[in-house]
């Protein structure tokens, strides 16, 4: 028998120390990684329930194990809520992550050697959209589209390449693109060449749910996403699809790619979707956009170039070359000053992928902890102050002290 009061603190002090240290880091640092956020206590509680004990291969009402009547309720709640949130005809909430969701789409519609077309990783795409080292680039003939001279998606070139290569699948979506994506135009091109149209909305899902970024669901055959990032849920994936594709997608997830779903995570997804359906979620996403705009404008005023000329979303790419520092070094020195960020390639980057000439900045996490325009502006000024003298130990210490004072006023978990 287990005693409920016997927790990690008593049973595994080494691990507990690491968890406590991470808790302290999250509270003390300004989180600027665009793909990270803070899940609510309710989401984390659901993920820590006894649902983790239950095997439930299959789908609600059609399981290969007994005793699934209660986890069926949890999964059906998640399905119904995510369909309502995005206006989808059908949904699968079982993917363990965004990459698994994308792989399921490939399994449902493609054969090895088929041609797929996605955004170039070097110009803002994602590795699961055809990168040569990824399964998507190894198993399929991957062709890519990119940006024009203004660092906007080159829709004309994309259309020409689609007609020239006749891909079986066209993917829209990105991991480092700050502007709106014209999903209707992609859909028309896919229709013209007879391709399945897939959208990976992982980065933009929270904004889309709030009606503040174009919704791909009316245009795409299939839409994939993560459930964390701007959605503020647990780490996991979802697939939204037209009703006509429901059977193919469900079969691709189980038994195609996965066995037992993570029912505790699915329960946490249901909580997150319910939170996103509340009026306060739109207010949160509106503030995410306001903070991103102020942050980008302030950095630009301090001499840093924002790729694509600005942002229409929660994130931005910052070109660091004017400061004579690489993304790798900037990530390290900003981290030393308690600002967590990630290095990121910029379009036509002369540096290696693990070095880069830029960083990617996002505002979802800072907004969750209560930052508004004033704090976003202060954060941008602190970033610029540090990058003006990135190798000055006294400057790093001074910026770190200001960061610590700022985060102390805005705890993540009160």
Curated annotation (Swiss-Prot):
This protein's UniProt keywords: Amino-acid biosynthesis, Cytoplasm, One-carbon metabolism, Pyridoxal phosphate, Transferase
One Gene Ontology term, aspect cellular component: cytosol
Subcellular location: Cytoplasm
Organism: Verminephrobacter eiseniae (strain EF01-2)
Main location group: cytoplasm
Role played: Catalyzes the reversible interconversion of serine and glycine with tetrahydrofolate (THF) serving as the one-carbon carrier. This reaction serves as the major source of one-carbon groups required for the biosynthesis of purines, thymidylate, methionine, and other important biomolecules. Also exhibits THF-independent aldolase activity toward beta-hydroxyamino acids, producing glycine and aldehydes, via a retro-aldol mechanism.
The keyword Cytoplasm appears for this protein: yes
GO biological process: glycine biosynthetic process from serine; tetrahydrofolate interconversion
Coiled-coil positions: none
Keyword Transferase: yes
EC number(s) on file: 2.1.2.1
Enzyme class label: transferase
Pathway participation: One-carbon metabolism; tetrahydrofolate interconversion; Amino-acid biosynthesis; glycine biosynthesis; glycine from L-serine: step 1/1
Disulfide cysteine pairs (residue numbers): none
Name under which the protein is recorded: Serine hydroxymethyltransferase
Site positions for Plays an important role in substrate specificity: 228
Positions bound to (6S)-5,6,7,8-tetrahydrofolate: 121, 125-127
